[in-house]
């Protein structure tokens, strides 16, 4: 429980946390560039955690290069998931469109529904899988570059080496995503703040995963 709580509260230990969060939040508004810089800032904040300094990285535009690698890798994984989901979805739509309301074939309509369910399952389960793989994926990319992040086997091996560690990290990332969305729920008033705060949380979560995956198993 302490591990979970720390992810939420560690950013405020930095005396300048509010200013840094707001600046990164404003930078995040810039399409694509903001997201890339935010990822790099998250990694730089994680570096500070590695050094034992519980302070957020300075808020500026200096993290584009580092964040770009993670952005590219995650984009490739996302596009692969979309392509996989479209394999059953496109035939489902084609079959459904080919059936008119008066002379539709019940078997074909049933097949279209089944294919739609398969596509939905692929998108849903694939998104969850990506979430739970994210800590290992980010660490691999940050250390070894884009090629390392795309070594699916290595990423999966690290993710499954300590299932409980991966489960906790994945659930915490889902919680961080919820925090990020709170600004949208509040009519976009706090979206700048909550999105950047979620990035700070992710730095702690991924660092915590890194420590857990490096620790030797008992027994």
Stretches with model-predicted labels:
Residues 28-50, 107-149, 177-217:
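Selective recognition of hydrophobic, aromatic-rich stretches within alpha-helical transmembrane segments
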Residues 59, 66, 120, 133, ...:
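Short, well-structured alpha-helical interface segments that form or flank functional binding sites
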Residues 78-89, 172-189:
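Alpha-helical transmembrane segments and their membrane-interface junctions
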Residues 141-167:
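A generic hydrophobic-segment detector
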């Amino acid at each position: 429980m302490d591990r979970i709580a720390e992810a939420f509260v560690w950013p405020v230990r930095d005396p300048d946390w509010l200013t840094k969060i707001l600046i990164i939040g404003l930078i995040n508004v810039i399409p694509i560039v903001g997201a890339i810089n935010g990822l790099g800032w998250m990694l730089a904040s994680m570096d500070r955690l590695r050094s034992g300094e519980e302070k957020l990285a300075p808020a500026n535009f200096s993290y584009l290069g580092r964040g770009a690698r993670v952005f590219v890798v995650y984009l490739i994984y996302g596009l692969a998931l979309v392509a996989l989901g479209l394999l059953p979805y496109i035939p489902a739509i084609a079959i459904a469109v080919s059936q008119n309301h008066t002379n539709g074939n019940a078997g074909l309509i049933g097949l279209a529904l089944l294919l739609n369910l398969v596509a939905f399952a692929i998108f849903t389960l694939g998104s969850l899988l990506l979430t739970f793989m994210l800590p290992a994926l980010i660490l691999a990319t940050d250390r070894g570059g884009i090629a390392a992040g795309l070594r699916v086997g290595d990423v999966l091996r690290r993710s499954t080496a300590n299932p409980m560690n991966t489960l906790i990290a994945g659930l915490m990332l889902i919680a961080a995503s919820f925090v990020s969305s709170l600004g949208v729920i509040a009519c976009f008033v706090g979206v700048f703040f909550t999105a950047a705060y979620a990035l700070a949380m992710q730095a702690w979560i991924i660092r915590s995963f890194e420590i857990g995956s490096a620790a030797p198993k008992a027994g």
